[in-house]
Amino acid sequence: MNNTYRKLTAQEIETLKSQMCTAVDWNEIEVAEGFAPKYVRWARMSGHIRLGAFNKEFCLPGGMKKHSGIYYATLHNVTVGDDCCIENVKNYIANYEIGEGTFIENVDIIITDGPTGFGNGVEVSVLNETGGREIMIYDRLSAQTAYVMALYRHRPEMISRLKEMIRSHVSSVTSSVGYIGSNVTIADAGYIKNVKIGDYCKIEGASRLKNGSINSNMHAPVHVGVGVIGDDFIISSGSSVEDGVTFSRCFVGQACKLGHNYSATDSLFFSNCQGENGEACAIFAGPYTVTHHKSTLLIAGMFSFMNAGSGSNQSN
């Protein structure tokens, strides 16, 4: 991201005004060298704003091309990197740093509100839905650490030390400013609040994402698809969550796939798990746990290298 910014010139301010742009205080807006005001139209800005240079053209499916810039959007305390396209934001974007080459279109609202750990530090009542074996999720959670925290409750001093280390990580990531990485796509999404989004992530049609981290990167991007509703979560690299999945207080490990209206609460899914159609409540899904069937309900169990068959209903 460009670290060299300057104030707007009087001519640039007049150009922006002629393009129906407004600002609470034009002195609070800084731009990168190479900034061209012609690519900012119908924008409302408040707080401290930083804008990059808009030179890139996005090639969209079907052959459509859109030039980077800001069109029909309201921004408050936002840094926009070079070559981003932000268009048709129904409400506003507030308190975010946005990397380079990111495409945001047709979204309702994207905000960071107050200090947040972005899903880090959330307690998940795994293995016992009434509590007692809670695990604090964080970006680097492993199956081994989670196993010890859940099953070694007879070692309270060790559990206390583990929680201290996790809280230290939570403190290091807690911020009042959210982050959207470089080359991210967010399109046709609804409500996004207190979510950290890594590089090359694609969010397409998600309904609601609240208090979470999506740890995507260039080599293992994350896809969040249509109709997804997520609260208090962490999604690790290379995973996909799509097709109407609803999940709350969940950790999704690397290369996992959740889809086809899967529902999960207070559960941990470690690497290479797959969940479709069914339900999960308070489960510890170790690596390669798979469930495909609508009639499958997994509750308060620990699994690994398992394919749950049709009718695996643990509520009976």
Role assignments for model-derived ranges:
Residues 1-316:
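Domain-scale signature associated with acetyltransferase and cell-envelope carbohydrate enzymes
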